[in-house]
Amino acid sequence: MKKLLVLLLVPFFAFSQTNPNREYWQTNKWTPKNGMNAEFESAVAKKTQKFNNTKETSFATYQLITGPDQGKYMRVMGNRTAADFDADDSKELDYWMKNVMPFVESNDGNIRWWRMKGFSQNWDNDLPPARFVKMTTYTVKRGMMSDFLRFWRNNTELQKELGYTGITGLFMLTSGGESLQLLEVEPYNSHAEGTGKMSDPEVNYIEEYNKMHGWRTHRNDERAATAAIEELWGVTIETAELKPEMSSKL
């Protein structure tokens, strides 16, 4: 608990490397004390209603429903500028310490990301949080990021051309975790409907990829992108479900 308190007393929005033109996001996973989920949920809901009731201060809360972190609560602070992290949040942090921390067992620490807009598609920050999010984390080998992103960029370009309806955001870690880490976020509202589809479900995707980017480029780009990912821990996939009462209502 002592280490946890030290972590929380660090300025909530402080980080060293920023770009004024980037769009920043922050995530943190929280574990309530045993048997205190209801108290934790209620305390977070009250804090969110009090301090996070505008678009500029909003938070979304999701609960992990798959993976080793199943059951943890993930707080998401999104669509911020670098300047937003200079705001004085001492009152908000003090409230959290007094009213939420008594029900907290641990947290994983803040992780900050910036959204790579050119590698995202159909992303709209004005949309309400989706009921579900599928999150795929990629850890890329040093010196091989360009190989990974080339395949991603080409796929994004083709999917836009083919009328893909799904929403995808690609985020790069800027502080709080493994370097060279990327997070793919796919919001959706129904398992039955899935994350998206092409306008023509019968399209030969590989053939269209090669038409757009060159003969055999799909095979070569896919191999290069796969080789760029760390072998043992390079890909993790999680799914989370929105907790509306613990999220901002805008």
Walk through the language-model features, giving the residues of each.
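Short S/T/G/P-rich N-terminal loop/turn motif that feeds into the first structured element of a domain
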Residues: S16-L250
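Bacterial Sec-dependent N-terminal signal peptides
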Residues: M1-N21
